[in-house]
Curated annotation (Swiss-Prot):
Protein name, as recorded: Probable protein kinase UbiB
One of the GO BP terms on file: ubiquinone biosynthetic process
Species for this entry: Paracidovorax citrulli (strain AAC00-1) (Acidovorax citrulli)
Biochemical pathway: Cofactor biosynthesis; ubiquinone biosynthesis [regulation]
Source domain of life: Bacteria
Length: 522
């Protein structure tokens, strides 16, 4: 009954904001297009379609807002006006009752909140659709009191999410089966990705592991602070981490007044991102201004502070090679190489005409070179390449789409800090170093080091293995030769039987004919 009521609510919102005309007018069947005209008759929709879609998602609640945020990253699928509007969605919901947060903590740790924390601030400092954050003080295993941030999962979310996802899957299947444009947008695939994303966010242990991995990777870089996870106080519904104190990166004038080098800050952000991408293959994929602060503390003045690790991206060596060579070929205007990279990736259908793909890529990329390098957006280049590839039915991998969205965020943030930021000059050393590492002796040395434990295990066994091989191989060879000779003898005997039998048959016929003739003449 609740799903039926929720479905009716969704239909009402769709009609109220005129979203039906976005879908029904693209249907192939004439009667459906006629239905669209009848439904929209006499209705005045003054707002643009992107704005109406955004307002409808906000009306449907936090799960649909989340869906819109995730959908806004798929610029390879969406028209620009819709993607830009969806990017404005804010995940802001009222905080839930502090008593509920306390009950969640006590249920997770099976003891009163006063025994878990030295002190706990009941008023949350931040609230979103999935969780909210409280400040607290905890005594660690060494007896030291530490200021921490406590992230508590919003209770009762799983049934709500599963209910809305079920309706989304039904709508996606309906749109994909009836509309050619809908099928091209792959709604069922998008909903499936959103399903995985939401269920990942519901497990705070996974987020804690992401934070710990990024902290370990970034420790020696010295440009970013990532909170330490207090694993003794973590649970799938509760995440406790070091409290970070900084100024939101959007408050540029406050940072400048404090003496922070804003231009260097812009370059540091790009350096952090490309280090995560090309060195580690593991990057923070939700680096919008709300998740980034800047430290003003003496020991870490001017460093980035990174927060919220629910969304991360992972890249294989193949993904990194694809990116590095694409960027390099783009700046060399080697569009044939860009097309070849798509072919080598294995994502291009077998019947694709490479010369047509190259021509389409040239049409996308060439206009960028009328601008100074500092005005070229690598994120936009990737996005346009993905859009062009989609026309040729190239399947772009989700991790690369996630990286493209993150790169756009980094570029936007960097140019907000420093409008003169030349992203290519900052990225080029990373690409060159990565390609040198892949083709030079360093890669060979890394592979030797990686395999050395295996070699060390096998080394003591080599003399015995060699002895066994030399001892058994002659016997094996002799046995094989004996079997071959025996088979040859059997074959020879068979051939002899056939030949002798045939000769006997022929001689018998000749003898019979000779006898018949003798009788005939006598």
């Amino acid at each position: 009954m609740s799903r039926l009521f929720r479905g009716a609510t969704i239909v009402w919102v769709v009609l109220r904001y005129g979203l039906d005309e976005l879908v029904l007018t693209s249907f192939q069947k004439p009667w459906l297009r006629l239905l669209a005209r009848i439904v929209s008759f006499g209705r005045k929709l003054d707002a643009p379609r992107g704005q109406r879609l955004r307002e409808a998602l906000e009306r449907l609640g936090p799960i649909f807002v989340k869906f819109g945020q995730v959908l806004s990253t798929r610029r390879d699928l969406l028209p620009p006006d819709i993607a830009n509007e969806l990017a404005l969605l804010q995940d802001r919901v009222p905080p839930f009752d502090p008593d509920v947060a306390v009950a969640t903590i006590e249920r997770a740790f099976r003891r009163p909140v006063g025994e878990v924390f030295v002190s706990f601030e009941r008023v949350p400092v931040a609230s979103a659709s999935i969780a909210q954050v409280h400040f607290a003080i905890v005594r660690d295993r060494h007896g030291v009191e530490r200021e921490v941030a406590v992230k508590v999962l919003r209770p009762g979310m799983l049934p709500v999410i599963d209910n809305d996802l079920g309706l989304m899957r039904a709508m996606a299947g309906w749109v994909e089966s009836l509309s050619a444009d809908g099928k091209r947008l792959k709604p069922r695939q998008v909903v499936a990705e959103f399903d995985n994303y939401l269920h990942d966010e519901l497990d705070l242990i996974r987020e804690a592991a992401n934070a710990a991995q990024l902290r370990r990777n970034m420790e020696r870089l010295g440009l970013v602070r990532i909170p330490e996870i207090l694993w003794d106080f973590c649970h799938p519904e509760v995440l406790v981490m070091e409290r970070m104190k900084g100024v939101p990166i959007s408050q540029i004038e406050r940072l400048r007044a404090a003496g922070v080098d804003i231009r260097q800050l812009a370059r540091d952000g790009v350096t952090i991102f490309f280090t995560q991408v090309f060195r580690d293959g593991f990057f923070h994929a939700d680096m919008h201004p709300g998740n980034i602060q800047v430290s003003l503390e003496p020991g870490s003045f001017g460093r980035y502070i990174s927060l919220d690790f629910g969304i991360v991206g992972s890249l294989t060596e193949f993904d990194k090679e694809y990116l590095a060579q694409n960027f390099t070929a783009f700046f060399r205007r080697d569009y044939k190489r860009v097309a070849e990279l798509h072919v080598e990736s294995g994502w291009v259908p077998a019947d694709t005409r490479i010369n047509e793909l190259e021509s389409a890529i040239r049409a996308v990329c060439e206009p960028y070179f009328d601008r100074p390098l500092k005005e070229i957006s690598l994120g936009m280049v990737l996005m346009r390449l993905f859009q062009t590839s989609r026309r040729f039915h190239v399947e772009i991998q989700p991790q690369l789409v996630l990286l493209q969205k993150t790169l756009l965020n980094i570029e936007g943030l960097g140019r907000q800090l420093d409008p003169e930021l030349d992203l290519w000059s900052t990225a080029k050393p990373f690409l060159e170093k990565w390609m040198l590492d892949q083709m030079g002796p360093q890669r060979l040395w890394r592979e030797v080091k990686a395999e050395s434990p295996h070699f060390a295990k096998m080394l003591p066994e080599l003399p015995r293995l060699l002895h066994d091989y030399l001892h058994h191989k002659p016997h094996d060879h002799r046995r094989e030769m004996q079997e071959l000779l025996a088979e040859q003898r059997r074959t020879n005997r068979l051939l002899q039987s056939i030949i002798y039998g045939g000769m006997g048959f022929v001689l018998g016929l000749l003898a019979l004919q000779f006898l018949i003739r003798i009788r005939f003449f006598h």
